[in-house]
Amino acid sequence: MAAQVPTEELKKLKVAAKSDDPAAANGANGNTANDSDGSDDDDEPEDAGAAAGGEGAKKKKKRKPRKKKKKNANGQTDPPRIPISQLFPDNSYPKGQEVEYLGENTYRTTNEEKRHLDSLNSDLLTDYRHGAEAHRQARRWAHKHVKPGMSLTDIANGIEDSVRALVGHSGLEEGDAIIAGMGFPTGLSINHCAAHYTPNAGNKMVLEHDDVLKVDIGVHVNGRIVDSAFTVAFNPRYDNLLAAVKDATNTGIREAGIDARLGEIGEAIQETMESYEVEIDGETYPVKPIRNLNGHTIDRYTIHGGKSVPIVKSADQTKMEEGEIYAIETFGSTGLGYVRDEGEVSHYAKRADAPNVALRLTSAQKILNVINKNFGTLPFCRRYLDRLGQDKYLLGLNNLVSNGIVEAYPPLVDKKGSYTAQYEHTILLRPTVKEVISRGDDY
């Protein structure tokens, strides 16, 4: 999920102290995603037996067998409905791409002290690998099924239903979505819209052949958020745009590591992306980094942590540190390379430093209670409130925004007529190695 470069006023805001128990602060009931038995009740009925023989016996009408979900080579159905915990017993989830540190940090791979520190992170790694495998399987469905003519609502529901099934939490019971589920609303931003767009109720938008679609998916398990995005384009004229951004993201991942300086990572990303150009309808465009969008750290139950990773050259000398978790994301554009807020808001999140304000509107009090119990500080959208049976909540929600309790995230757009692309991975700066937790065979 994209992080904007903060304004000077936002820079002055004090960062609230974080709770020692994020799960409790977010209303979790003490259960964890790995406590779920993940039982699956999709057993198929047996075919009806042959009718009894005998003279004059009436011929029984054959029962039409239920259509079975197709299974992939890994035992998963299509669409994916078998929880990841059933496919990987004993929490033996696949590792991400492990990359050894370079330079002065080469020693970390074999250092006994660092290996011991790494072993203390088993719960964190289990949760992240669980979420990452759910992410890979959900986006595998998207790669296969997202086609021109599909509505954005169907795409969003297809991805989100898959994620919830894969982590074994539907999110319909109070507090269930805080244990595991969507890390943030699925971003489906088209063409000059770069980020923070997901359909609200009644949305009629349909994906067209010449569209460039950014698919930004967040999966969380016990508040550990996997944030990873890719771009879909059906017309090959956009190939270089997608290649530029994918290459730039991989450059950022390569340069990232313990003691790496954020400004230098941004410079390397910019150099890579600006080495590309794309020809559209006979006109050549340089691929520009969207300079006011950043990568970012990820904290537990908080998608945007305290550090930002620029995608252009910066004087920021801040270093990455051991134990941090980063979303390395880059955005490229054929337009201005700068985005602004425009359009109907769909994304919201309760602020971690939300003030204690006396709310006068009953509707605001009611919807805040729903947010606290079902999302905590995880981002959500209007569809998620609709799904929980909430209605007539918009006035109350807007009141929470105006009181600084909830942050609204409008769509971020470049110049109309331009095209934008995005690629993103989540990386863990473990004591011994850098793990690209969301890496898959697709990107």
Swiss-Prot record:
Biased composition annotated in UniProt, kind: Basic and acidic residues: 8-21
Subcellular compartments: Cytoplasm
A Pfam family per the record: Peptidase_M24
SS bond partners: none
Listed EC numbers: 3.4.11.18
Composition skew (Basic residues), residue ranges: 58-72
NCBIfam families: met_pdase_II
Official protein name in the record: Methionine aminopeptidase 2
Taxonomic lineage from the root: Eukaryota, Fungi, Dikarya, Ascomycota, Pezizomycotina
